[in-house]
């Protein structure tokens, strides 16, 4: 099967240049690229779709280039932005670029036989560029009218856009040209907001290769949306990162398992490597047995394992199951730290402290009276076990690896006692 057929079946193709020519070209191996600017020290799930697109092309026998924007990251892409980006110091951007390189290595095979992926950093050519030569040889191929007409620029004109960000599309176009010259790269892929920058690159290569048979292509993926109208990739706690130190595998797993029924089939197509037939089967279950949430569980399993590995995925599933069944006592200290990293907590040194007082210290209740009433009514659980004895001390309670006590008051309010 031509990879374009699979991508279209999954809804992953938003726009392409000359689709017929691209389809024919993809019948044999080709080199393509996608760029990732280091705007933070980690990629987030908004980057996941294009990253997985590179992986899909590699699995189909093509050669992907992951381009880290060590140079363009110093400028800032205006696409999709309503205001000027904050410019970061060079050393910070290069440090972030190195961390992003490490993350990309988890998704692509850079040492495989036949079609190993290529890692590049555009700082290699943008960092040493000669301004006069660049304006003479590259700048003359861009008309001000076409640059102003690009959506990423036009949408910012009323609010103001600096020459720095205005020139970004020229730099991205130059990247495509350099990768074409260095590696024979014939296609750039990106999000739908990158269409203007991508076509600027194809136009530049065409103008720079008059008389040569150099045909290049562009492909964009759709914007990932949520049916409830909220922004994809954002939670109450902020962005969902691919770095487990910024978003734990458990929180990452929870993001996917909480997917709306209206979105889950789309996300299975976008973010997993399950076959179209497997996804169709899960889609039928969403219609006939939505309460089982099998599609959401499969989505969370596949994406968490893809990003964080089998062990982290199993740990996330274990924490989720413990919270659902009340089996907190079966968790390890590491799992407790991961699963309860953002609940109210307090350090307790005196293990002779009454549980009633520990409830006050972690913020579960505001007074001893409220603590006693909550316990006597059966609303307080310690490590999954209901506690009604108001005379209990911390020392008398079971602990997780002698380090933690997990308190639940009511159905969903959790608190963590850390023994020090």
Curated annotation (Swiss-Prot):
UniProt binding sites for ATP: 234
One GO CC annotation: cytosol
EC id: 6.1.1.1
InterPro entries named in the record: aa-tRNA-synth_I_CS, aa-tRNA-synth_Ic, Rossmann-like_a/b/a_fold, S4_RNA-bd, S4_RNA-bd_sf, SYY-like_C, Tyr-tRNA-ligase, Tyr-tRNA-ligase_bac-type
Claim: DNA-binding is one of the keywords in the record: no
Compartments where found: Cytoplasm
Motif, 'HIGH' region: chain positions: 38-47
Keyword Signal: no
GO MF, any single term: tyrosine-tRNA ligase activity
SMART domains: S4
Catalytic activity: tRNA(Tyr) + L-tyrosine + ATP = L-tyrosyl-tRNA(Tyr) + AMP + diphosphate + H(+)
Pfam families xrefs: SYY_C-terminal, tRNA-synt_1b
Ranges spanned by the short sequence motif 'KMSKS' region, renumbered to the chain: 231-235
PROSITE patterns attached to this UniProt entry: AA_TRNA_LIGASE_I, S4
A Gene Ontology BP annotation from the UniProt entry: tyrosyl-tRNA aminoacylation
Domain named S4 RNA-binding: residues: 353-419
Binding site for L-tyrosine: 33, 168, 172
Top EC class for this record: ligase
Main localization category: cytoplasm
Domain of life of the source: Bacteria
Coiled-coil region(s): none
Similarity-based family: Belongs to the class-I aminoacyl-tRNA synthetase family. TyrS type 1 subfamily.
Function, in words: Catalyzes the attachment of tyrosine to tRNA(Tyr) in a two-step reaction: tyrosine is first activated by ATP to form Tyr-AMP and then transferred to the acceptor end of tRNA(Tyr).
Subunit structure, interactors included: Homodimer.
Protein name: Tyrosine--tRNA ligase
Organism this protein belongs to: Desulfitobacterium hafniense (strain Y51)
């Amino acid at each position: 099967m031509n990879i374009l057929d699979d991508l279209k079946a999954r809804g992953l193709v938003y726009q392409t240049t000359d689709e017929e020519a691209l389809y024919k070209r993809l019948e044999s191996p080709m080199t393509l690229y996608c760029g990732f600017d280091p705007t933070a020290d980690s990629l987030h799930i908004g980057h996941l779709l294009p990253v997985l697109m590179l992986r899909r092309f590699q699995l189909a026998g093509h050669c992907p280039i992951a381009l880290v924007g060590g140079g363009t990251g110093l400028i800032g892409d205006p696409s999709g932005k309503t205001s000027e980006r904050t410019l970061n110091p060079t050393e910070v951007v290069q440090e972030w670029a190195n961390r992003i390189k490490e993350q990309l290595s988890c998704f692509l095979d850079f040492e495989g036989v036949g079609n190993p992926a290529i890692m590049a950093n555009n700082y290699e050519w943008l960092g040493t560029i000669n301004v006069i030569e660049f304006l003479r040889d590259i700048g003359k191929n861009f008309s001000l009218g076409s640059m102003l007409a690009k959506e990423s620029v036009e949408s910012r004109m009323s609010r103001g856009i600096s020459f720095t960000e205005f020139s970004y599309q020229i730099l991205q176009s130059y990247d495509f040209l350099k990768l074409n010259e260095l590696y024979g790269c014939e296609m750039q892929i990106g999000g739908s907001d990158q269409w203007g920058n991508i076509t600027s690159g194809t136009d530049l290569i065409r103008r720079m290769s008059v008389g040569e048979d150099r045909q290049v292509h562009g492909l964009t993926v759709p914007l990932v949306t949520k049916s409830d109208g909220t922004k994809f990739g954002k939670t109450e706690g902020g962005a969902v990162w691919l770095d487990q130190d910024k978003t734990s595998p458990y929180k990452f797993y929870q993001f996917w398992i909480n997917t709306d029924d209206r979105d889950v089939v789309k996300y299975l197509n976008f973010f997993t490597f399950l076959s179209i037939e497997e996804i169709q089967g899960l889609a039928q279950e969403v219609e006939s047995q939505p309460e089982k949430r099998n599609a959401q569980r499969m989505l969370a399993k596949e994406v968490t394992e893809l990003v964080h590995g089998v062990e982290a995925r199993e740990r996330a599933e274990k924490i989720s199951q413990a919270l659902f069944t009340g089996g907190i006592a079966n968790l390890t200290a590491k799992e407790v730290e991961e699963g309860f990293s953002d609940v109210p907590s307090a350090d307790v040194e005196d293990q002779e402290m009454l549980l009633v007082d520990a409830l006050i210290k972690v913020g579960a209740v505001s007074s001893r009276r409220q603590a006693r009433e909550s316990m006597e009514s059966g609303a307080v659980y310690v490590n999954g076990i209901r506690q009604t004895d108001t005379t209990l001390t911390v020392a008398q309670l079971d602990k997780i690896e002698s380090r933690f006590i997990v308190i639940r008051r009511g159905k969903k309010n959790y608190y963590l006692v850390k023994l020090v």
